[in-house]
Structure formats: structure tokens, C-alpha cells
Design a protein with these regions (language model features):
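Phosphate-binding site recognition
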Residues: 1-187
Length: 187
């Protein structure tokens, strides 16, 4: 519910619907300067298959699906051919980088929402053990690399990815994949 509310509040596509969405709420009378200023990119990693051998492909498919939804929802803010160019990239990380660099050039803002960031890693740890868990979250593991890309995409002035809200159950995965991810605050 919180992630849905954040998405509705910050989504640039909801600028004309603020009263409809929040008219009876305290926030309607006390809006922040950032309301309806972001394109919203959402992931829910509970949809990722945690079975070894299927994990990375499932992660890529989930991310690609969400990136396509993002492109469809906000294509009107980008140049013609944006979606096609996005799909010419081969991985979730390169697609995310393309979205960020293109949005940055256009001075658009992105708010990234990740629900259950640790769902599949907790399942791996409890079901398949530490070795399988480490493959995804340590060294050159794909999930660790994904968080390295997120950090990179927030580094520097004028980057479109300005905000992230990430939920999970356990700090274990966050500690393992976010070494050096000093752009976060636990709440």
C-alpha cells in the first residue's frame, strides 16, 4: 500500500489527478514541491523465480517486463523511437542505463521503487544454501552488479535517477549487495 501511495503521489502522469487521488487526505492540503515530478519505475522481486539455473533469467525477464511497462507509460516524454532503442539493449542493466542517460539529457526525473528486494535471495538462502546465495550476491554476482549499476546511476550531477525506495524483510541481502552503496538510509 505504501509503495502504491508513493507511486501515485510522485508520478508525473498524475499531475492532473492530484485532487482525485488525494483530495480527502492531509497531504492534499500540504503538498511537497516534488509531488507529480517523477517518472516511476517499479520492481517487485517476489516475482523472480529463485530456482538455481532459472534465477538470473527470471530476474532479467522480470526487469525487462517492468522496463517495457515504464517505456510504454512514459514514451510520450521521450523522443520518437525511445521504446525500440530501449529494447535493442540486451540486459536489464544496460536498459536501465539507457533510460537513465536519456532521461538525464531531457532533464526528466526517475523515482525507483523496489518491493521485496530480498524475496528471492531469502528463498535461495533458506532452500538452496549459502553457495547458491553467494553466486548471486557476492563478487561478480548479477544481483550485486544490479545494485552497483543503481549506485552508478545516482552518481553525478543531473542524473535522472534521483530517488529510490526499497523494501525488504531482512538486512542480510542489502548488506551483501550494497557494499559501498552509501546512498541509502535505513528507516
Amino acid at each position: 500500500l505504501l509503495i502504491n501511495m508513493l507511486a501515485a503521489y510522485y508520478d508525473i502522469n498524475n499531475a492532473d489527478r492530484f485532487k482525485e487521488l488525494f483530495g480527502e487526505q492531509w497531504i492534499y492540503e500540504h503538498p511537497t514541491s516534488l509531488r507529480a515530478k517523477f517518472m516511476i519505475l517499479r520492481f517487485n522481486f517476489s516475482a523472480v523465480n529463485s530456482t538455481p539455473g532459472k534465477l538470473e533469467e527470471s530476474f532479467e525477464e522480470h526487469c525487462t517486463g517492468r522496463l517495457v511497462e515504464f517505456a510504454d507509460k512514459y514514451e510520450h516524454l521521450f523522443q520518437p523511437g525511445f521504446r525500440q532503442e530501449l529494447m535493442s539493449r540486451t540486459t536489464a542493466s544496460t536498459r536501465l542505463d539507457y533510460i537513465n542517460s536519456t532521461a538525464s539529457r531531457l532533464r526528466l526525473r526517475i523515482y525507483l521503487l523496489i518491493d521485496e528486494y530480498d524475496n528471492f535471495t531469502n528463498t535461495i538462502l533458506s532452500t538452496f544454501g549459502k553457495d547458491e546465495y553467494r553466486k548471486a550476491t557476492h563478487g561478480e554476482g548479477f544481483f550485486r552488479y544490479f545494485f552497483n549499476v543503481l549506485k552508478f546511476l545516482t552518481s553525478g550531477n543531473g542524473m535522472a535517477l534521483e530517488r529510490m525506495f526499497i523494501t525488504g524483510v531482512s538486512p542480510i541481502t542489502l548488506d551483501d549487495v550494497t557494499s559501498g552503496f552509501n546512498i541509502r538510509t535505513n528507516i
